[in-house]
Amino acid sequence: IANGFYGLMCANSPATSQWSSFKSTCNYNTWVIGGVFCASMAFLEYDPDYYMTSVANSIRGLEYSVCGFAPSGGWVETPGYGDIAYHYLAHFTSTSEICFGSSFKLPQYQGMDKVSAWRTSMSGYDKTALIGDGSNTGATTDSVMYMDKYYGTDDYRAVRQEYVMSGHVQPELYDVLY
């Protein structure tokens, strides 16, 4: 697998890492660059210099994404797309803290600490307020609960607990972990 990725990861290409998509505030940026970050971490031992360049470029790219959060925690696109962005930023945060002992201050950007409250206000137990072409599925439980714990808030966890206790949703592993 490493041979398939080696030399082909677009975050390392000087031209591609300057491509506008890598400097975007859209959810696509967090999705793709979050994947490049995780793949780089998986293959880091094979060529540390190469893959650390991918890691550095990924972090730089994610700095553009976090600017998509409003001070209130809202997302520049729609609640559904915001959930995608938040989901991958939560995975980045947990992975980077485990691997590097740092989240590189990405969760400290404006509004990030209020996303959970915003997502909770936009979602019921199984649907999200549909705006534009975004999905109307409920919030991604693992990422929202992880970030609730990260910020020391109970915005989503408290509502989620009520949904579980009232029988509206089945408990998940994350209900126990967080």
Regions found by a protein language model. Name each.
Residues 1-123:
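Aromatic-lined, polymer-binding surfaces characteristic
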Residues 81-178:
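Carbohydrate-active enzyme catalytic cores, enriched for enzymes
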